[in-house]
Each structure stands twice: as structure tokens, then as C-alpha cells.
Amino acid sequence: MKKIQSLLALLALLLPVCAAAQEAKELTADCAITSGKVRTASAHDNDYTTAWRSERVRRPYLEFQLPEGETAGWLYVCFAEMPQSWAVEEKIDGKWQVVADGSTDYIHALVELSGQNRFRIVENSGIATRLKLNEVFVFGEGDLPDWVQRWQPTAAKADLLVLATHPDDELIFFGGTIPTYAVEEQKNVVVAYMSYANAARRSELLNGLWHMGVRNYPVIGTFGDSYSTSMTEMYSRWGRQKARGYVMELIRKYRPEVVVTHDKGGEYGHGAHKVTSDACVYAVENAADASVFPALAEQYGTWTVQKLYLHMGEENVIHMDWDVPLASMGGKTSQQLAQEAFLLHVTQQKTSYVVTDEGRTGNANFSLVYTTVGPDIVGGDFFENVE
């Protein structure tokens, strides 16, 4: 019995060691990272706001040389601009050879390697261009840290579409919506944006969503980021048909049962938020009519949304409780997760915006402005009455 107890005690001591041995070591700081005569520090300074770019040439690259005896198991690339085509190459017998073709599906991309010591990222479209990166990270073999993103495709069919104008709007104005439904309730949630503002904020967007437990890649629109209090002016800048068509495509392509978007007054009067809200109402009301944007109807079919909620409002208002602990996220509340995610929007930390359910633009009140399943009676759940 004593021998068995001693063996069990020894195993208990060894288990943490085994677990630790499986964790991938970050090797970025150990690498010699080069790209011809171009300085590369901004590609690996842990600052998403200091984008790195190569020379403008055919096949621009960023090369990594690990110390002797060290090998790479993973390469995590955060692009500032998606290349037309790219790959990871290894030098074998004096020649660069492709070891992994890069995907253009995700702006933050993870590549599994197989013990390379010297390798490079290369843009291989054949045209003269620049390689533009926000950050790169190199890891050895093993289990990656939780913050490294390995995105899955956008859900083919949405239960819920969350439509925000800019990065961080989904946190400030919609509070715990995303972690509550995408993670705790395990709904198919499509998070979509009209604009990503700039490359740094797009990376912050992804970092924030990932922190909240989102694993399906968002839809990131390309409308320009500018300010006006006028909805008419913003429609002029974005194009009324283009903005409405973008939202209509989201609805017909992803077929959500419920849609959540901005206050019709633009939250604090922002014209771009007003356009998002107005275009969303238009698209929801007309998505079942094949004569409206007929090309999209032919491509995706028509669709009938069951419920549309706008942030705030004065009629048919429900209050969402974002302070309920989520078992799926270790007991943190969805509001806490949204607040933590907002901290990852580093460029916005000097603004006056906060993630809270208090105040005039608090993120807990929503108005039901369109429904095919009747009014909310109980409240507190976007999916009340949804079939």
C-alpha cells in the first residue's frame, strides 16, 4: 500500500511537469528577423499600432532565423493588409520551397510548422507590392497560449446577427450580447461591422472578440471611417444603395432569426451609426421581397427575420441583465468580458467611452422595432417567442 501511495504521490508531482512540457514556448525574441535592408522591429514589438511594411518589390518577405537547436512549431501572423497571395517557405538545399500555403480568409492567421529553423513569410502573387504586418509571433511545438487566435469560418446560418458600425461599438453599445449568446447560449452568432476604421483597430476588433470566447470569424465591412452628425451626409459618403445592399446581403446570406443593431439616433448622434440603423431597418423590412436587390435574392434567396432590436429606444423596450455569471467563461459576467475586451482596443483608451449599463447610452436597454412573432412579454431575452 505504501508503495502505491508513493507512486501516486510521484505521479502527482510529475503531472504538472508533463503539462508544462506540452506548452509551446514563444521564440519570437530569439529569432533574427530580417527583410533585406528594411528594419523589422515594428513587426514584433507587441504593438498593433506600429505596422511594419516591406520594400515594394516582387515577392516581398519577412525572414526568421532561429538559434541553432531551436525549431518552430507555429507562426502566428497578424496582417495589416491582406496579401493577394502568400506562403511560408523554408530554405532547403539552398532553395526556398513552400512548406505552407497561406489562407486569405483571416487577417490574423495561424500556420502550423514542422520544426523549421529558418523560414520566411513571402507574398507570392508575382506583382510588385508590399508585405504589411501588424505583428508576428513564433512558437515552438506544443499547446499554444489561449490568446493565439485560430479562427473558424463565419457561421453559415445565423441565429443572431449583431451589426456594429465600428470596432468597439459591439462592446460599448451592445454590452454582453456577444458572450451571452455566442458562448454561454451556444447560438450561431454572426458579428458584422460596417467599417474597421484602420488596420490597428481591425486587429483590436479580433483580439476583443477572441477574448470574449468568439471563435467564428466576423464579417468586416470596408466602408470608410469618418464623422458627421448627418445621416444624409454619411449616406452620401458611403452610398445609400451600397450601404443598404451590404446589410441586405448579410441578412439574406446568413439568414438570422434575430438582428441587433444601433439606436436610430446614432447613439450619441453619429451619422454612421444612424446609417447602420436605418439601412438595417430597411433590409429587415424588405429582405423577403425578391424585387428589392433582386441580384441578392437570386444569389441567396429571400429571408424573413423574426425580430429586430435597436439599442435604446422608447417603445417596446426590454432590459438585458449582463451581470449574470457565465458558467462557460469561469463565472465572469458578460459585462465583465465586454469590459475586458474593450481594454484590448488600446487605441480607444484615451476616449471618454466606457462599457456600462448605466447612463444615457447604457448598453442594457433595447427596443423591439420589428417582429413576426409578437411582442415580448417576459423580456430579458432576444429570443423570446423565436421559433
Predicted regions and their residues:
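Bacterial N-terminal signal peptides that target proteins for export
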Residues: M1-L8
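A general structural signal for short secondary-structure junctions and capping/turn motifs
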Residues: K2, W210, L250, A297-T302
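Active-site beta-strand->loop->alpha-helix modules in alpha/beta enzyme cores, enriched
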Residues: E81-Q84, I92-F293
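Bacterial N-terminal signal peptides
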Residues: A9-P16
